[in-house]
């Protein structure tokens, strides 16, 4: 299982929320301050999803060819257990 904080949303939940954020930001009635908050939340969710995908890619590489996979934990990718929407 992927390293995630218990309160961090999963990938599918994050993507669903991103889709909702897109709909809300496209709505002409969304106030500017609300739009800014939605964009900030969306950026955090995007980083979270990228981290999940990065971890999954490393796991797949390890399973596919465990002898040639280098330790890639020192990348600039955010750690999935660092998720916080606040």
UniProtKB/Swiss-Prot annotation:
<comment type="function">
    <text>Bidirectionally degrades single-stranded DNA into large acid-insoluble oligonucleotides, which are then degraded further into small acid-soluble oligonucleotides.</text>
</comment>
<keyword id="KW-0963">Cytoplasm</keyword>
<comment type="similarity">
    <text>Belongs to the XseB family.</text>
</comment>
<dbReference type="GO" id="GO:0009318">
    <property type="term" value="C:exodeoxyribonuclease VII complex"/>
</dbReference>
<keyword id="KW-0540">Nuclease</keyword>
<comment type="subunit">
    <text>Heterooligomer composed of large and small subunits.</text>
</comment>
<dbReference type="InterPro" id="IPR037004">
    <property type="entry name" value="Exonuc_VII_ssu_sf"/>
</dbReference>
<dbReference type="InterPro" id="IPR003761">
    <property type="entry name" value="Exonuc_VII_S"/>
</dbReference>
<dbReference type="GO" id="GO:0006308">
    <property type="term" value="P:DNA catabolic process"/>
</dbReference>
<feature type="region of interest" description="Disordered">
    <location>
        <begin position="64"/>
        <end position="86"/>
    </location>
</feature>
<dbReference type="GO" id="GO:0008855">
    <property type="term" value="F:exodeoxyribonuclease VII activity"/>
</dbReference>
<protein>
    <recommendedName>
        <fullName>Exodeoxyribonuclease 7 small subunit</fullName>
        <ecNumber>3.1.11.6</ecNumber>
    </recommendedName>
</protein>
<dbReference type="Pfam" id="PF02609">
    <property type="entry name" value="Exonuc_VII_S"/>
</dbReference>
<keyword id="KW-0378">Hydrolase</keyword>
<keyword id="KW-0269">Exonuclease</keyword>
<dbReference type="GO" id="GO:0005829">
    <property type="term" value="C:cytosol"/>
</dbReference>
């Amino acid at each position: 299982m992927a390293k995630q904080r218990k309160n961090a949303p999963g990938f599918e939940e994050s993507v669903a929320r991103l889709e909702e954020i897109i709909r809300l930001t496209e709505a002409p009635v969304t106030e500017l301050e609300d739009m800014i908050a939605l964009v900030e939340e969306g950026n955090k969710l995007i980083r979270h999803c990228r981290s999940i995908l990065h971890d999954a890619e490393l796991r797949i590489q390890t399973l596919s060819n465990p002898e040639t996979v280098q330790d890639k934990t020192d990348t600039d990718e955010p750690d999935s257990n660092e998720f916080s929407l606040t």
